[in-house]
Amino acid sequence: MQRKQHPLVSPATGTQRHVVSWHYGQPDSTGPHVYLQASLHADELPGMLVLQHLKTQLDAAEAAGRLTGRVTVVPVANPIGLDQTLMYAQLGRFELGSGKNFNRHYPNLAA
């Protein structure tokens, strides 16, 4: 398993944000490649929980040599939305600055 951090544009000096992906199987595998992500709408937590659980199963499968392809897991596809709260309520569906839906508006956030 390989963990990768993909940097995002920083909202303020001295801060950092990343999307984290977990990669299972051999990178040069010619077998199937499955990509799984959760929480593009960051307030949708069940998918995050499922992928966290799946990661432990993939760890075991990889250690036992049972993976014939590759699997990429991104449990939190929207760390910006996950960090947005207002009066103790998580508001991960819409960007607070513009009010735009994260699943309809895709700003370039790559650093």
Positions of the model-derived regions?
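Structured catalytic-domain cores with a bias toward divalent-metal coordination
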Residues: 1-111
